[in-house]
UniProtKB/Swiss-Prot annotation:
Protein name: Low-density lipoprotein receptor-related protein 3
Glycosylation, residue list: 71, 199, 359
Domain LDL-receptor class A as annotated: residue spans: 165-201, 211-250, 415-453, 454-490
GO CC annotations, alphabetized: clathrin-coated pit; membrane; plasma membrane
Species classification: Eukaryota, Metazoa, Chordata, Craniata, Vertebrata
Region feature Disordered, mapped onto this chain: 635-770
Predominant location category: membrane
Amino acid sequence: MEKRAAAGLEGAPGARAQLAVVCLVNIFLTGRLSSAVPALAACSGKLEQHTERRGVIYSPAWPLNYPPGTNCSWYIQGDRGDMITISFRNFDVEESHQCSLDWLLLGPAAPPRQEAFRLCGSAIPPAFISARDHVWIFFHSDASSSGQAQGFRLSYIRGKLGQASCQADEFRCDNGKCLPGPWQCNTVDECGDGSDEGNCSAPASEPPGSLCPGGTFPCSGARSTRCLPVERRCDGLQDCGDGSDEAGCPDLACGRRLGSFYGSFASPDLFGAARGPSDLHCTWLVDTQDSRRVLLQLELRLGYDDYVQVYEGLGERGDRLLQTLSYRSNHRPVSLEAAQGRLTVAYHARARSAGHGFNATYQVKGYCLPWEQPCGSSSDSDGGSLGDQGCFSEPQRCDGWWHCASGRDEQGCPACPPDQYPCEGGSGLCYTPADRCNNQKSCPDGADEKNCFSCQPGTFHCGTNLCIFETWRCDGQEDCQDGSDEHGCLAAVPRKVITAALIGSLVCGLLLVIALGCAFKLYSLRTQEYRAFETQMTRLEAEFVRREAPPSYGQLIAQGLIPPVEDFPVYSASQASVLQNLRTAMRRQMRRHASRRGPSRRRLGRLWNRLFHRPRAPRGQIPLLTAARPSQTVLGDGFLQPAPGAAPDPPAPLMDTGSTRAAGDRPPSAPGRAPEVGPSGPPLPSGLRDPECRPVDKDRKVCREPLVDGPAPADAPREPCSAQDPHPQVSTASSTLGPHSPEPLGVCRNPPPPCSPMLEASDDEALLVC
């Protein structure tokens, strides 16, 4: 109900603002904030909003007396341009000075009454006609209220003026307003122009008994309305002409033994005035002389300190206490059932209590009182249920309230088709069995959802005979008036907490994904920030930064880029072979590296070398000792070859480990000593022995350096060693050579042949052997 009302407030235009005004008005009228909060949650903490065209509103616990300390509120919302008309059927609110204790408030009112419409007392108020398309209603009972007033019951209808026609069960006023048919000729002007009370030949449709104020009762057989005080009811004297004030009176003795299978009894102060100065204690023993169950129904009017105890079995304490009832159960009927056919009822009342005791009826289950009809029957052909052991009286027939679990008391009513049931209040509306007890109102007053003995599938049956949705069961919020929907629930986490946890985990997971995405994005941007601004010059600069390390000092001398210096080591044959192997491996590695680079990389490399590097020998052309000349010998496969057609140059000086002097700088031979002559050819210079030579091929041979006896003469000949002249020129052995140093080799060569390529290389590398 509260959930449905909240949903209705969202759909109504301006409903929230109007609800705020309602709250402020209630605070102003009651003077307490604590009274305003329950008012917004009408009667048991529920807000009741009405948007139906026709409906019925009544006070809490109707038709019983309303409880003290109650705040209720209702809100009727119409369409734009609608006029809302309210007519009171019953009205009994405890009267006080200026209606300061208990009151009913309606607003906004029509001109000339602009202020709120505040009511109390027992007289039927005039019809209320709204000035706008909405009406708010407040009901308040003070905590000090006696609780002896019945309350009110009103009907309303909304619509526009100037209607051309009305529904079949409605009456059209002269001003075009449509009213329910029973409102015609009821002595109350609901049309506003008096047209509903004109030409009335029949008496008012309301029975005269309904016009008696609270605290009185009518004489049912009187031709005119006569209301008597309740103290004269069942006092042993006939005050009504037909004796109706003494008809059907219960036994008012203070306790006795009852032996019939049905009967009734009441406390002595039920119809009496205020209790005397002494306490009252009465006990009733009920013995139906039957082993079947016995049903007990009580209507309580207890005072603040009064109470009733019901026991199963006979005796002052009985066998088992069934229930203890206090004033809190005053305004609702109480039904108890004993497993045996015997009951004990004990009543305790305080002196000068404001209560009026109780009225009780009992019967064996399955039997009905003489003036009642059974809900069940011997067969279910007439609409009854074989298992329904309830009863109903003739006034309860077709009153819109189910007194039988099978609904037999509401079947076959003349106002509805055979397969439908009437709504409460005589509105003429009907509903089907499928609309019964499904937590969805089909009647304006919700009669189809009251006194439910069973519920439709998908709903839960409350202890107060109401039905709610099954999903509202154990959701942490009491939706039944007795809170039975939250009883027996497991100690589980409420659904709201689970929903909040799921939403929170989803949000946290989403934030984690976003954080990881940002981290990966930043990492990607940092790794790509240089590539994002890459140009031709940046690529060339990167290539320049990644160039190979410059050659060492020894490699520069070996390549002939710088002249030899003193004390630089001399390459022996074994060292030259190792160096040649290293160079060959380097060339292969460079060729392999060049094969991986694309043409564009090679072109960029050549362009960079031309722009920023001074000319130098290609990588593959590495001279052994000195810069390349036409007659220079380049180390190819371990031997020196002269270039063809070139003039024979003096042989390149062989370097020893201790000195870098050339052979031509040898000191002259000793004077007077003839030069030594080799086996064939001119005589050897002074200080040299005949070298030991061995042929390598047809044109070349290798000679071991002859032993040097002394420094060579300065004028020693510098003739190259050849096949015809096998005497090589050698350098002087260094004095720094140790005894284990390898002996230098002299290489004899023919005139150098022309240079020709020996090995395949890349585009920017040239390997020539001369």
